[in-house]
Amino acid sequence: MTTKCPHFQTQQCQSCQWINRPYDEQLNEKQIHLKQQIAPLDQSQLRWSAPFQSRQSGFRNKAKMVVSGAVERPVLGILKDQNAPQSAVDLTDCLLYSAGFKPIFPVLKDFIGRAGLVPYNVAKQKGELKYILLTESGYQGDIMLRFVLRSENKIPLIRRELAKLREKLPQLKVISANIQPQHAAILEGEKEIFFTERQVLEERFNRIPLFIRPQGFFQTNPQVAEGLYGTAQQWVKDLPVNKLWDLFCGVGGFGLHCAKALQEKNPDIELTGIEIAPSAIYCAGLSAQKCGLKKVNFQSLDAANFALNQDENKPDLVIVNPPRRGIGKPLAQFLNQMQPQFILYSSCNAISMTKDLLELTHYQLQKIQLFDMFPHTSHYEVLTLLIKR
């Protein structure tokens, strides 16, 4: 089965480069790629699980819309050419987006006109509204709306029209403006101005509350993310673990899932989560509190620097979920020397993951599974469990 996209057929949008390929073929191609990448590793004790499949449409919980056109007729989508406003493509009917976004787009287009949010013109470096960012929580259908603006000039007008907007769209629970003054291809700036009392969305995966905040990373395919975290939980729940680290922990998805399962058998389990982004650590702390988990410590630090400076308190399990570049040679070598009993490695880049695993000479690859987090593209997530030889 293939997904038919009119924007791809007319070459207006080429983001989903594999969308014309049958889904089974996409999965098979990704599995072959993964097997090719890990070929240099010892697989004598490796157990493969079948790829975790995604829905093929309506799976994406986030919409990042470039705003162009005229204030009375805004276009929400992409610019094929940053310097040519006439190259705008309206993607409000994108097949990837959650159905919850569909009724929102026309109301937002009307709101842009009412509030006088002139779309930013890259070529002329004029205008105010650069992007509209939407994020949906599947837990209660709540939505976060963010306006990315060049300046604070239009903030009073947004406030003036906000009550009408919320009346039409009561599902908008978090609304903010992000100020990005630079004339550069940068999505967001440092300053966030909230128009609502609430500043986070609550999501729930496997009955564990997770929180989404502006400027924080959260997986864009919640169905597959829930499967990924749930699988990690199942893999570790019966392991002899008393202390675990969750490095590059983000909002705490992996660590909280694992700690909750482990603490049900041993309440003295200790979790330390490390992430450089303060907003993510704030969300992770909220989750731990709402879960009622004890002996949990989340810190806003560089994950590699934290690990490399630990002389004592060796963990039994280390979870790593690094960015595409991987954990890097120094951290991989440190873990190899420290020798925790188990390492759970989640990666969005099998090439860098394999480089890291080759440094872990004291470890045996035990389990592996591909998660199709990004359908219709060549990208995927992979989860592996390693045990000390």
UniProtKB/Swiss-Prot annotation:
* Documented EC number(s): 2.1.1.189
Q: Coiled coil where?
A: none
Q: Name one Pfam family in it.
A: tRNA_U5-meth_tr
Name the catalytic site residues. Answer: C348 (nucleophile)
Residues that hold S-adenosyl-L-methionine according to the record? Q219, F248, E275, N321
* Position of the signal peptide: none
Family according to the record: Belongs to the class I-like SAM-binding methyltransferase superfamily. RNA M5U methyltransferase family. RlmC subfamily.
Q: What is this protein called?
A: 23S rRNA (uracil(747)-C(5))-methyltransferase RlmC
- What is the originating organism of this protein? Mannheimia succiniciproducens (strain KCTC 0769BP / MBEL55E)
